Amino acid sequence: MYAIAFLVVKDTQDYHPKGVQQAYTDIGAVLAKFGFVRTQGSLYINMNEDMANLFQAMNALKQLAWISQSVRDIRAFRIEQWSDFTDFIRN
């Protein structure tokens, strides 16, 4: 399982033609094409173990004309285990 996490800077409104919120939406749409699902905030996970898929997703993000000036930090990492404690905390 792989994850991608990123931070979009406030100045994105100067680079993206439709502003910060649309930038997040566009990033999510690109990642969804490669099977990534938003879990919280700017964290997207993918159950696919194929690193080539991860690279293809990153290359697709890189094609967005505004992204290099809008993302302060973007990281990809492998998740060994994923435990969802939401139900445990709520009950």
UniProtKB/Swiss-Prot annotation:
<dbReference type="GO" id="GO:0004518">
    <property type="term" value="F:nuclease activity"/>
</dbReference>
<keyword id="KW-0540">Nuclease</keyword>
<dbReference type="GO" id="GO:0003723">
    <property type="term" value="F:RNA binding"/>
</dbReference>
<protein>
    <recommendedName>
        <fullName>Endoribonuclease VapD</fullName>
        <ecNumber>3.1.-.-</ecNumber>
    </recommendedName>
</protein>
<comment type="similarity">
    <text>Belongs to the VapD ribonuclease family.</text>
</comment>
<comment type="subunit">
    <text>Homodimer.</text>
</comment>
<keyword id="KW-0843">Virulence</keyword>
<keyword id="KW-0378">Hydrolase</keyword>
<comment type="function">
    <text>Cleaves ssRNA, mostly between U:A.</text>
</comment>
<dbReference type="InterPro" id="IPR016368">
    <property type="entry name" value="VapD"/>
</dbReference>
